[in-house]
């Protein structure tokens, strides 16, 4: 049996971290978390998750900055990023104006719809041949 896929949850709100961590763990994923962008980058670099969920508004280093840093690092640029944030519309508009930045794999408003979020996570983490 293969190892469970790892999801890194980068979120500064403890309740949201608990919700997402429980949701993903209950569905067979290994979950690690970080409370800000700087910690998220360090954990992504050290643990190479299969997918990252990311909030935009966080202390110390914003999700936007972390997203750009991940895209700029060749070792991490291929990790799918799912934005889960309260400012989805503004972020989408920001990314659409930046041609040098690829958009994230998906966007979800807070609180995300559980079934839609899981469907997208499952789709993104399917083996490439199964997609």
Annotate each PLM feature.
Residues 84-86:
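Hydrophobic/aromatic residues positioned on beta-strands within the core alpha/beta folds
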Residues 18, 65, 88-109, 115-119:
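Alpha4 helix (beta4-alpha4-beta5 surface) of REC/receiver domains from two-component response regulators
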Residues 11:
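Conserved acidic carboxylate
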Residues 59, 68, 77, 89:
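The feature encodes the CheY-like receiver
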Residues 14-32:
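Two-component/phosphorelay signaling modules centered on CheY-like receiver
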Residues 1-8, 113-131:
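Non-catalytic signal-transmission and effector/linker regions of two-component phosphorelay proteins
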Residues 47-53, 58:
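Active-site beta3 strand of CheY-like receiver
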Residues 36-39, 62-68:
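Acidic catalytic/metal-coordinating carboxylates
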């Amino acid at each position: 049996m293969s190892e469970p896929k790892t999801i890194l949850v980068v979120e500064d709100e403890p309740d949201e971290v608990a919700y997402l961590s429980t949701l993903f763990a209950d569905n067979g994923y290994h979950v690690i978390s970080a409370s800000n962008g700087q910690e998220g980058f360090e954990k992504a670099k050290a643990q190479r998750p299969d997918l990252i969920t990311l909030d935009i508004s966080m202390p110390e280093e914003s999700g936007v900055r972390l997203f750009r840093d991940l895209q700029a690092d060749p070792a991490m640029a291929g990790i799918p990023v799912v934005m889960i944030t309260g400012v989805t519309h503004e972020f989408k508009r920001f990314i659409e104006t930046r041609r040098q930045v690829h958009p994230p794999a998906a966007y979800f408003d807070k609180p995300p719809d559980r079934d839609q979020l899981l469907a997208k996570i499952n789709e993104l983490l399917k083996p490439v041949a199964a997609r």
